[in-house]
A protein has these predicted regions:
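C-terminal beta-sandwich/jelly-roll accessory domains of carbohydrate-active enzymes
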Residues: 259, 611, 617-693
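Surface beta-strand/loop "capping" patches
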Residues: 225, 234-237, 574, 581, ...
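Non-catalytic, glycine-rich low-complexity segments
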Residues: 219-247, 298-308, 315, 586-602
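Conserved SGNH/GDSL esterase-like catalytic core that processes O-acyl groups on lipids
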Residues: 21-26, 31-120, 299, 305-307, ...
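Short, conserved helix/loop micro-motifs enriched in His/Cys and acidic residues
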Residues: 26, 339, 346-381, 484-493
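Extended acidic/polar, glycine-enriched regions
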Residues: 242-326, 397
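Bacterial Sec-dependent N-terminal signal peptides
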Residues: 1-20
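Alpha-helical cap/lid subdomain in secreted, periplasmic
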Residues: 19-20, 51, 77-217, 467-559, ...
Length: 693
C-alpha cells in the first residue's frame, strides 16, 4: 500500500513532465561517498544503486566524508555544500545514512540530547523546501564499525549502539521507513578494510538493500533452508516459521488445517506462528504462499528437536566409530530425522584454493542440505555421539527426534559466539584483535588457519576458527527454528587456557540462550576424554565445576573411554547415551533414569581417617572388578600420592575411608587415566579435586 501511494504521488509529475525520472538523493558521509574506493564514481553505493534501479530513476551521491548529523558536531552535514545541493535538487526520494561520525568523542558525549531534534530537522528541511513534492524519506541504521577502529573500546562501540537506537526511534516517531544497513555487513568484516568503510562489494550490498526498500523487491517468497520436507517440528510449543517476501505482500500459511496470514514488512521479513502440537505419529504438511509463489513441505513429524554442535568429536561419524555395525542394525523402528550441516572444505592439513576462500568470505561454508529420513547411508555419515543421543531419546520417549548437527573439526568455542556478545564482553573482545596472531586463541588453531588460508591475498580473509564465524554461518541461519536444547562436545581447541575457557564457555551458553530467546534452554556437554596432554586433568575438573555454575547445564563423563594418543576415541555410543540420560532425567522428568556416576559431596576427617562421601551411588564399585584406581591424596604441604586400596583405603557403600588425614583429594587426575570408579549403574566418576574440611 505504501508503494502504491508513493507511485500515485510520483505519477502526477511524471504525467506532466513526460516520463521525468524519479530523483533519489543519497545523503550521508564517507560511506555514501565511497571513501577508500579507487574510483567512487564507479563503485560507490549510489552509483551501484543507479545501475540496479535503471533508467526510470536518477540517483545522485550527496555524501561528504566526516559529516555529522549533529548540528554542533565537528563537521555538521547541514553546513556542507552537499546538503545545500541535495535540497536544491528537489529529490523525490531521500535516503539518509548519517551518524557514524557522531560517535566521535567531540560529538556524542556533548550533544547526544540534540540528536533527535537535529535528525528531524534535516528530514523536515527536505519537505519544507519543496512542499509540493513531499519526498519519501528513508532513514538508515548505520553500517558497522568493527573492533579494529582506533576508538572502538574507548567509546565508539557503546556510542554506536546508542545512536542506532536513536535512529530506530526516529523512524518510528515519524513513520519513516527504516533500512537496516548493518543487517548483512555486520557479519562481513572482510568487506571493511579500515573497520569503517565498505569496499565496492560492501557498497553493492548497501545498494541492494536500498534498491529493495525503494522498489519493494526482496526477491519474492523465500525461506531459510532449515525448513524442508521431512523436518521435525518441536512439540509442545508454538511453531513459528520465518522468511522473506516482497514488502507489503500478503503471506498465507497453512499447517494441516490451521490457516494464518500476515503482511511482509518494509524489510521484506515476515513470520507466521502456528499453534503448539503434540507428537501423534502422523505425517503433516505446511504450505506458504506469497508473490504468486507457493512452497509446500511434506512428511513433517512432530517431536523433539536438538542441536548437536562442537568440534571433531561431535562431527565424528557413525561409520568411523567402534559401534558402527550395531548402530546400523538398530535403525529400524525409530523415527529419527537428520539435518546434517557438512562443511564445504575441511580444516585438514591443506591450503585451500581461491574458490574455497571466496566462498568462506561470503558465508558459503556449509554445504546446502535438507532434512533427511534415517537410512543406512545417512546414519553412517552422521555424528555418532548425536545419533546415539537421539536414538536413546526416541526409544525412551516414543516420539520422532530431529537432530541438527553443525560441528566443525578443530573449532574453538569462541567461533560459535555471536559478534555483539563478544564485542561487548570486557575480556573476550580482545579475542577479535588480530586473531591469527592472538595467543588467547590456541596456537594449533592459529597455525592450521594460517595454512588453510595461505593462498589468500586478503588480510581480512575469513576462516571457521575466527571468533564469531561459525555463529554467523552455522548458528544464525538456524536460529529461527524451535529446538528443545543443545548438546556440545568441544574443548580440545580451548584446553590451552583453562581460565579463559571458563569465561568463553559461560558466554557461549548465554549467547545461544539469547539467540533462541530461552534462558532455561538445556545445554548438555561432554567432558573431555583422556589423552596424554598435560593440561587436560585441570580442564576436565574445570568443566565439572562449570556445570555447577550454570543453571540447566550438565555434563557427561568420557575420560573412561579415552585413548593415550588418539584425540578421537572411537567409543562414541556410551557418550551419546550419557548425554541422553541427562536430558531424560532433567529435561523430560524421567527421574528414575540414572544420569551421573559417583559424585563427591564432601571430604572430612573422622576418627583419624579421611572420609569422602559420594552421591549418585548407593554402592561404589569399579568398572573392571579390580581394586579402585586413580584416587590421590595430599598433605598440607606435600604433593599428591596414589591411594592403595589393598592396604590404605576401603569402600563402605557410598563412602571411601582412607587411613590417616589428608588435606586434598584428587581422582582421575592423570592426562590419560585408567581410573575405574563407577556406581551400580556402571556410570563413571568424573575427574575431581576437593578440599578436605
Amino acid at each position: 500500500m505504501k508503494k502504491l501511494i508513493l507511485s500515485l504521488l510520483l505519477a502526477l509529475p511524471l504525467i506532466a513532465a513526460a516520463q521525468e525520472k524519479i530523483k533519489v538523493a543519497c545523503v550521508g558521509n564517507s560511506v555514501t561517498y565511497g571513501y577508500g574506493h579507487a574510483n567512487p564514481a564507479e563503485t560507490s553505493y549510489p552509483t551501484q544503486l543507479q545501475e540496479m534501479l535503471g533508467n526510470g530513476y536518477e540517483v545522485r551521491n550527496f555524501g561528504h566524508s566526516g559529516a555529522t548529523l549533529l548540528s554542533k558536531g565537528h563537521r555538521p552535514y547541514i553546513n556542507l555544500p552537499e546538503y545545500a545541493a541535495a535540497i536544491e535538487w528537489a529529490p523525490d526520494i531521500v535516503v539518509i545514512h548519517l551518524g557514524l561520525n557522531d560517535t566521535d568523542p567531540r560529538n556524542w558525549p556533548n550533544y547526544r540530547d540534540e540528536f533527535f531534534g537535529d535528525y528531524t530537522a534535516i528530514i523536515e528541511s527536505f519537505r519544507a523546501a519543496h512542499p509540493d513534492k513531499s519526498p519519501k524519506i528513508y532513514v538508515c541504521r548505520m553500517t558497522p564499525i568493527f573492533h579494529w577502529h582506533r576508538r572502538f573500546k574507548s567509546g565508539t562501540r557503546d556510542w554506536y549502539w546508542q545512536i542506532q537506537e536513536r535512529i530506530e526511534g526516529i523512524a518510528r516517531s515519524g513513520d519513516f521507513e527504516l533500512i537496516d544497513l548493518s543487517r548483512y555487513l555486520y557479519s562481513r568484516p572482510d568487506l571493511m578494510p579500515d573497520a569503517l568503510h565498505p569496499n565496492p562489494e560492501g557498497a553493492g550490498i548497501i545498494a541492494g538493500q536500498v534498491y529493495s526498500a525503494i522498489t519493494d523487491d526482496f526477491g519474492g517468497l523465500a525461506l531459510p533452508a532449515i525448513y524442508s520436507d521431512n523436518m521435525v517440528v518441536q512439540r509442545g510449543v508454538p511453531f513459528t516459521i520465518h522468511g522473506t517476501a516482497n514488502a507489503g505482500s500478503r503471506v498465507k500459511g497453512r499447517f494441516d488445517n490451521e490457516r494464518n496470514s500476515t503482511v511482509a514488512g518494509d524489510d521484506g521479513s515476515w513470520q507466521l506462528t502456528f499453534e503448539a502440537r503434540e507428537a501423534d505419529g502422523k505425517s503433516h504438511k505446511i504450505k506458504i504462499e506469497a508473490d504468486g509463489k507457493s512452497i509446500e513441505f511434506t512428511n513433517i513429524a512432530i517431536g523433539e528437536v536438538w542441536l548437536c554442535s562442537g568440534q571433531s568429536n561431535m562431527a565424528f561419524m557413525v561409520k568411523e566409530s567402534s559401534h558402527r555395525e550395531a548402530s546400523l542394525a538398530n535403525i529400524e523402528g525409530k523415527d529419527i530425522r537428520l539435518y546434517d550441516m557438512k562443511p564445504r572444505v575441511y580444516t585438514d592439513n591443506v591450503e585451500w584454493d581461491t574458490t574455497a576462500l571466496v566462498a568462506l568470505n561470503r558465508h558459503d561454508y556449509y554445504i546446502p542440505t535438507l532434512w533427511q529420513m534415517q537410512n543406512e547411508e545417512n546414519v553412517s555419515n552422521f555424528s555418532a555421539v548425536a545419533y546415539h543421543f537421539g536414538a536413546m531419546l526416541a526409544d525412551s520417549l516414543g516420539v520422532p527426534v530431529g537432530l541438527i548437527c553443525n560441528a566443525i573439526g578443530g573449532a574453538p568455542a569462541e567461533s560459535f559466539i555471536d559478534r555483539k556478545t563478544i564485542e561487548h564482553h570486557p575480556m573476550l573482545v580482545d579475542l577479535l584483535y588480530n586473531w591469527k596472531e592472538n595467543d588467547m586463541i590456541q596456537d594449533w588453531c592459529r597455525g592450521r588457519a594460517a595454512q588453510n588460508i595461505a593462498k589468500s591475498t586478503n588480510r581480512l580473509q575469513r576462516h571457521p576458527y575466527e571468533p564469531c564465524y561459525l555463529y554467523e554461518t552455522g548458528i544464525a541461519p538456524i536460529a529461527c527454528y524451535p529446538i528443545s536444547g543443545a548438546i556440545w562436545y568441544q574443548g580440545e581447541s580451548n584446553a590451552h587456557n583453562v581460565e579463559l575457557h571458563e569465561v568463553i564457555f559461560l558466554t557461549l551458553v548465554d549467547s545461544w540462550r539469547r539467540t533462541w530467546n530461552n534462558p532455561i534452554m538445556p545445554f548438555y556437554f561432554v567432558q573431555l576424554s583422556s589423552i596424554n596432554r598435560p593440561s587436560w586433568p585441570h580442564f576436565r575438573d574445570s568443566q565439572r565445576r562449570l556445570a555447577t555454575k550454570i543453571p540447566y547445564c550438565d555434563f557427561a563423563v568420557s575420560s573412561d573411554i579415552g585413548h593415550p594418543t588418539d584425540v578421537h576415541p572411537k567409543e562414541k555410543a556410551p557418550v551419546g547415551e550419557r548425554l541422553a540420560r541427562l536430558a531424560l532425567n532433567q529435561f523430560y522428568g524421567m527421574t528414575h533414569v540414572a544420569q551421573h556416576g559417583p559424585t563427591p559431596v564432601k571430604a572430612y576427617i573422622e576418627g583419624g581417617n579421611t572420609i569422602i562421601e559420594f552421591e549418585n551411588a548407593a554402592t561404589i564399585t569399579t568398572s573392571d572388578g579390580n581394586k579402585l584406581r586413580g584416587l590421590q591424596i595430599a598433605g598440607e604441604f606435600g604433593g599428591f600420592a596414589d591411594v592403595d586400596f589393598n592396604s590404605q583405603a576401603t569402600i563402605e557403600g557410598n563412602r571411601i575411608v582412607i587411613d590417616g588425614t589428608a588435606h586434598r583429594v584428587r581422582y582421575a587426575w592423570r592426562p590419560y587415566t585408567d581410573a575405574n570408579m563407577v556406581n551400580e549403574e556402571g556410570l563413571p566418576a568424573s575427574t575431581f579435586e576437593i578440599e578436605v574440611k
